[in-house]
Structures are given as structure tokens and as C-alpha cells.
């Protein structure tokens, strides 16, 4: 019997998938690939069910001879292992970013006489409704809130882009780039206080109140599904911060980043050119601990932003603070620098990783923007924010 292969990236089997299977059965034994979470998030949406559950879904389809694991977007490994006579897919992959996948398959199969079968894509109300329901599920707080932690487990580095409105959120949500056979998209969104304030014509001094900031979150959440990292500035008074944490958790935000400064907030990139006061380690640890204590779930991350390098307090101070903040309950450390050379950031990461292998590190390479994600990841960085 000839072998025919197809790959599914879905949480729900609908008639479109069944049409593919039924057409495939006409040509031979049907092998179905299930794409891993890590591969899916490179060009598609995040799954709402586990990888194992998706495998079981496909195993339950009548006519499927074997289920295979596809751990890359491109089909090179699968074709090398299975050597299928045919690869079948909906004809929606003839255009857009997915065309690169089809071109890759055609090239692989042509090497030994295999063929691609394009089946008319199933456009109807039932399929549209299923797709819409999956998207709605992804946008629900209980699913969105935990997604950043899930991404940290499967992505070498979580790519995050700044958003400050529903429109910029849609751009972050829908942008997919293909380059030399590799797909990329943003994994998460950063709601920056600087951009939120600027969009409202206000200075970046924590003038925009939390009620207004929460409205921005609502606008973004209404039209997106990706996890949100919230710029919490200093967090304000500890007594106020605990209520901010409760609100963010309830809304479905995945992380809040607070910086260890006090008084009237000034943009970090001003450095020592303006007066900025760093909080004491004891006070900031108390704020972190208070925020963690009021959480109802473990999903929301409180990430401590260390400003020692910005304020020229030295590497030892930065490391001392970072370790203290983690001990106080911080789920991650953000280290910032206004130097154009990434050397001090990389030095911090290396020294921090020497003592702490697991706590996520966040960087924002606004000034040292010549460094690559691969370089950052090699030094232990887990989240990169473009803002």
C-alpha cells in the first residue's frame, strides 16, 4: 500500500479534517502528524489542550493507520523517516506564509517522485464556528494567564512586542514572518507605561492611573489571545500594589514587572542625568512578598526589575538585589541597561546563572539593539521585550 501523509494543528476535529482523511484513504494508508506545541507556536496559535490529548484526538479518527509526531514546521524529518508517496493538505497553503511550507514539501517529494495533493479548503459556518470558539477559549483569563509560563517551557526565548491599543495588539497577534524556511511570530505582548502614557499625551511619571491602564488591557484583550506582560512601573505603595496584583490576576494578565525605585518615576534610559532613587532591598522584597501572598493562583508572575546598572550602582549591587528578590518570591528578574554595548547585561546574566539556573531573565535591548536572540539565549535570557 502507498503511504499518504497529512499534519494537523488543531484542538478540535471538524469536517474539514475528516474531508482530508476521507480523501487520503483513496490513495493508500493514512499517516497523520500531530505538531508539537513548540512547533505550533512558531506559525499558528497556542493549543488549548495538551499535546497528548491532541494525539488521542487523531488516534480516534477512523481510517488513520498511524499517528506521528512532527516537531518542526517544515516536513524534512517526516519525509526522511516516512518517505510518503503523497502529502495531502487543504489548498489554503497555496498562498500566504504557509506557501513556504508547501514549496518545501514539493521540493522534498520531487526528489523521489512523490506528489502533493491539494484538497479544496472547507469553508462553511461549522468550521468557522469551531475556529472562533477555539480563539475565544484562548482569550479567556484562565487560559491566557498561564500561557507565559507554558511558553517559557517550550520556547528557547519568548519574543515580546510592545502594544498600547487594540490596533497595535492586532498587529502583534497577526504578524507572522517566514525567512529561509523558518517561521517566526511574537509570543507575548508588553503593555508599556511609557507608550501607554505617550499615546494619551501624558508624561511617563506614573501619571496615568491604574483604572486607565486597565482599560488599555481590556482593549488589547478584546481582540487578541497572546499572553500579556504588564509594565507596573514601581508598583506604587505596597498597600496599593496588592490590589493591582489581584486585578491583573483576575483579568488574565500573565506577568507584572515592577522596578526597584521610589518617588516620582522617571524613564530608566535617563539614567543618572535625572534624580532617581532606588528602593532599599528590604522594602522592595516586602512589596514582592506582599504581591505573591494575595495571589489566588500560581499563574501570574511577579518579575522584579533591577535598576542598579541604570543608576551605576555596580554589578555586585545588581546581583545582590536579584538574588534577594528571588528569595522574596519574585518569579523572574529583569535587568536593564542604557549602554549601547550589551557587555554588562551579558556579564550579569552569566554571573546570575552561575548561582541560579532556573529563574527567568528578562531583557529589553532598546539601547543595545545589535545583539541577536540566539546570543541572548546562549547567556541564559528567557524573555526579550522589543519596546
Kindly label every feature range from the protein language model.
Residues 1-141:
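Nucleotidyltransferase catalytic core that binds NTPs
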Residues 141-366, 370-382, 386:
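Alpha/beta enzyme core
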